């Protein structure tokens, strides 16, 4: 068998396993506790960017509380359909949870136009009406993170179990992350401009796999 054939017929699970071996080798000594390390490694796996080993900031009980809540059936609120699409809904549903995303709803767009704000901000207000424990996964829109910060500060929303705040970009991105880090809420935040939908989904999936004891690393 040629080298090309060997590459073509490598099984997805084998590729993933080898990828995590490479990440472990290149990451080296990191000083992270085992569960936090799994989250960091899954983000690196999704992005091929080792900068996240330094830029990801975890509040004291972020991973522990996130895993426990998902295991108990917490649902996930995503700021975009891309984040929602990347989350392993099969594993989430096995615990009784689901993914909510409101940004594409017609009435959300209409209300945003009427109020002169963004669909992302209105989406967070819609999420505030949901019952039960929630994990927020914000990977694209800093306006969603800003709206969530306001809702938490105004006590207009039950305190989220966990906020994954990893929007990407240049405008209000750093500021929105710093505000969430100052709130009395467990959080996982990518400091700086980097982040994205892929990062948000990877973090949620890492927590789901930890909750299900799925050794995908």
Task: Please annotate each region the language model reported.
Residues 83-86, 142-148, 170-174, 196-200:
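Short glycine/serine/threonine-rich phosphate/pyrophosphate-binding segments
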């Amino acid at each position: 068998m040629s080298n090309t054939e060997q590459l073509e017929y490598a099984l997805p699970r084998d590729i993933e396993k080898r990828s995590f071996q490479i990440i472990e080798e290149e990451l080296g000594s990191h000083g992270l506790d085992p569960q936090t390390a799994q989250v960091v490694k899954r983000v690196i796996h999704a992005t091929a960017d080792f900068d996240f080993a330094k830029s990801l900031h975890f509040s004291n009980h972020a991973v522990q509380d996130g895993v426990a809540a998902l295991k108990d059936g917490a649902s996930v609120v995503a700021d975009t359909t891309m984040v929602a699409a990347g989350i392993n809904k099969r594993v989430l549903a096995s615990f009784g949870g689901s993914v909510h995303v409101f940004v594409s709803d017609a009435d959300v767009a209409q209300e945003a136009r009427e109020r002169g704000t963004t669909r992302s901000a209105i989406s967070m207000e819609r999420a505030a009406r949901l019952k039960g424990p929630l994990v927020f996964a914000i990977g694209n829109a800093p306006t969603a993170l800003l709206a969530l910060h306001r809702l938490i500060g105004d006590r207009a929303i039950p305190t989220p179990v966990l906020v994954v705040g990893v929007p990407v970009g240049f405008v209000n991105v750093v500021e929105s992350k710093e505000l969430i880090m100052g709130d009395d809420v467990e959080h996982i935040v990518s400091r700086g401009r980097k982040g994205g939908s892929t990062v948000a989904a990877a973090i949620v999936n890492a927590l789901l796999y930890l909750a299900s004891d799925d050794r995908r690393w």
